[in-house]
């Protein structure tokens, strides 16, 4: 099992976002702004869904990695740290999904 974490990915996205856009895809996406990054996130989500529906496990793994990466870029542009997302997940898992949904 890999020791690589989402926190590692967040750090890498942060570092690469500071590079010149012509040298880094991450920097290029960040420079293009949230509409471009969010569109790319949506494209990757669709590709992951298609891989899941067709049962292509290898492609689903590949597309899930793309999806997580692009989500981290969108969060970076929005100024939302991964810790905030993890905190929300922790809050939600403290109760059943049905209870959480009813509380909205």
Swiss-Prot record:
Listed GO MF terms: ATP binding; phosphoribosyl-ATP diphosphatase activity
Tell me the protein family, please.
Answer: Belongs to the PRA-PH family.
Q: What is its EC number?
A: 3.6.1.31
Its annotated compartments are: Cytoplasm
Transmembrane stretches, start-end: none
This one is known as Phosphoribosyl-ATP pyrophosphatase
Q: Give the matching CDD domains.
A: NTP-PPase_HisIE_like (cd11534)
């Amino acid at each position: 099992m890999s020791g690589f974490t989402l926190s590692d990915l967040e750090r890498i996205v942060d570092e690469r976002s500071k590079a010149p856009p012509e040298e880094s895809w991450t920097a290029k996406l960040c420079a293009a702004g949230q509409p471009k990054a969010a569109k790319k996130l949506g494209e990757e989500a669709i590709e992951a869904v298609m891989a899941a529906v067709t049962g292509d496990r290898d492609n689903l793994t590949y597309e899930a990695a793309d999806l997580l990466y692009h989500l981290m870029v969108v969060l970076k542009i929005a100024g939302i740290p991964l810790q905030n997302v993890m905190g929300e997940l922790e809050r939600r898992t403290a109760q059943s999904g049905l209870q959480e949904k009813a509380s909205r």
